[in-house]
Design a protein with these regions (language model features):
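Domain-level signal for soluble alpha/beta catalytic cores
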Residues: 1-245
Length: 245
């Protein structure tokens, strides 16, 4: 148990001035590759703030989604093509994800009809607060299998999941008939370097359940825990493994 100070919602949530477009532009100016921007999703935000205004997480999430939608439209107008809304809470509370979380996730992308825009969501299962820690809570192992069909039926183009820190029963990948899957193959909170052979083997495991054209190789999540040099080593091996296919 712990105590912490949280921002508190005391009135209706509305979008104000843009907060991500300039950040995306500055980073995009450093490369000729299309950069992805990430935004926390409404259901995950509701779990990390206090609330004295809304009568339910669902209704709070609706207004949060509308505010996020305004920012996403600004990003699209600025030229951003890859927009990811992070919803790790879907793995913690899959029933809520099914009841209203996925609906509010779709609401974030309302009226985004440009076919060149990739609508992405990231759903990881929890990590430690320091590198190489092993005793930390994870989301239930069956979470992905509970929400995979609903995600495939949604407007989301690509779903990002973790698999390196804890191997999944990959049967749920069969549920993705049209959705692409960003498949986590590199641990982001472990200093152990995955071998090329290990990554290739796990890709082959996944390809038993999903088409190659739908599978995207990636780390489990962000690389903030890893020292820069170690992160580069892990990514280099991951790319070498991916290029084997």
């Amino acid at each position: 148990n712990y105590k912490c100070w949280l921002p508190t919602i005391t009135s209706k949530v509305k979008a104000k001035e843009s907060f991500l477009v300039e950040e995306w532009k500055k980073n995009q100016s450093l490369t000729n590759k299309d950069l992805k921007i990430t935004i926390p999703g409404p259901m995950t935000i509701t779990d990390t703030i206090a609330n004295t205004f809304y009568d339910s997480d669902e209704h709070m999430g609706e207004d949060l989604a509308d505010a996020i939608n305004v920012e996403i439209k600004r990003l699209v107008d600025a030229g951003c093509k890859y927009i990811q809304v992070d919803e790790p809470l879907f793995a913690r509370k899959p029933e809520n994800a099914l009841n209203f979380g996925i609906k509010n996730l779709e609401r974030c992308f309302k009226d985004i009809n440009n076919q060149s825009i990739e609508k992405i969501t990231h759903i990881c299962c929890g990590y430690p607060d320091k590198l190489d820690a092993v005793d930390y809570p994870k989301a239930p192992l069956d979470s992905y299998s509970k929400i995979s069909k609903a995600l495939d039926e949604s407007i989301i183009d690509t779903v990002s999941i973790e698999d390196a820190h804890r191997y999944n029963d990959l049967n749920f990948l069969k549920d993705f008939k049209q959705t692409k899957v960003i498949f986590g193959l590199v641990k982001i909170a472990s200093s152990q370097v995955e071998s090329k052979e290990e990554i290739v083997s796990r890709i082959n495991d996944a390809l038993k359940f999903i088409d190659k054209e739908q599978l995207i190789v990636a780390p489990d999540c962000g690389l903030g825990h890893l020292p820069r040099d170690l992160a580069k080593i892990k990514l280099k091996i991951m790319v070498e493994a991916s290029n084997s296919f």
